[in-house]
Amino acid sequence: MAVVLKPWTVLVALVLCLLVCLGTFVDAYPPKPENPGEDASPEEQAKYYTALRHYINLITRQRYGKRSSPEGVMSELLFGDNSEHNQRSRYDDSYMW
């Protein structure tokens, strides 16, 4: 006997999966440090500015690597992680007659 799912149950399951996936993106960035206010002590202000500088460095950090160029990303998507494919052309193979 086949089980038939109602359309609303599929929609509810899809929405729940989407919420779980979006929840993982929220945890990806560190929380912004709280401002201690105008009447805070100099030690608290220094601690806040250190935490703020660390937060800004984390958020604006540049990612360097072998896939930093758009061509590298496209070649990896099209050909996989095989670096030999980029180095050889199709005319390098010798034809055997």
From Swiss-Prot:
One of its GO terms (biological process) is neuropeptide signaling pathway. One of its GO terms (molecular function) is neuropeptide hormone activity. InterPro entries: Pancreatic_hormone-like, Pancreatic_hormone-like_CS. One of its GO terms (cellular component) is extracellular space. It holds the Pfam family Hormone_3. The modification Tyrosine amide is found at Y64. SMART domains: PAH. It comes from the Eukaryota. Residues 68-97 form a propeptide. Residues 1-28 form the signal peptide. It is found in: Secreted. Keywords: Amidation, Cleavage on pair of basic residues, Hormone, Neuropeptide, Secreted, Signal. Belongs to the NPY family. PANTHER family: NEUROPEPTIDE Y/PANCREATIC HORMONE/PEPTIDE YY, PEPTIDE YY-RELATED. This is Peptide YY. It comes from Anguilla japonica (Japanese eel).
